[in-house]
Amino acid sequence: MTAPRRQRFFSWSMGLIACHLALSLSQASPALLPGVKPSSQQRLSVWGFDVYDARLWVRPGFSVASYSAHAFVLELSYLRSLEGEALSKRSIDEMRKVGAFSRDQENNWLKAMLDIFPNVQKGDRLQAVYAPNAGAEFFFNDKVIGRIQDPLFAQLFFGIWLHESTSAPAIRQAWIKGL
C-alpha cells in the first residue's frame, strides 16, 4: 500500500471510529429508557483532578426539585481510573449527606454496591436508571451489571447529584438551568 493510500485509509478508519463512538454515546442511554433526551454534560473535578463527566437523560416534564418522581438515566463517563470499592464507599458517604439511614441499610447497600460496581478506567461509562418507588438498575459500558431494588437506596443514591444537599451543587444548578 502506498503512503497516500495508507494515509487515506487511516483517515477513513479514524473517521469511522469517531462516528461509531458518537453514535454509541448518543444512543446508549435512550435505549436504556425510551423517550429520554440528554441534559447538558457537567464535569466533576476534585482538587483540580477531573473525575468524570455527568449527564442526565430525562423525559419532558422532568424537574430536578422533584427528581424522585421521575424515571431517568444518570450517565457518568470516567476521566480517570478508580476502584469499585472506592466508588461504593464514597457513594455511602455522599448518600449520608442527602438523608438518614440505618447501619443495617448502610451495610446492605455497601455490600450490594461492592458486588455491582466495577473498577473503572478512563473512557468507561457507568449508567444508572432510576425507577420511582422501585430502585436502580446499573449498566457498565451498556451492559447490565446489577440492580438494587430498594426505593430509599435509589432516592438517596441519585440524590448524590440531584438533592439540594448535594456536595456537587454546581452540577445540580447547571442541570436546573438547562432543563
Language-model-detected regions and their locations in the chain:
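Bacterial N-terminal signal peptides that target proteins for export
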Residues: 2-14
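Ser/Thr-centered flexible coil motifs
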Residues: 2-4, 24, 102
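Terminal leader/tail segments of proteins
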Residues: 27-140, 144-179
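Bacterial N-terminal signal peptides
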Residues: 12-24
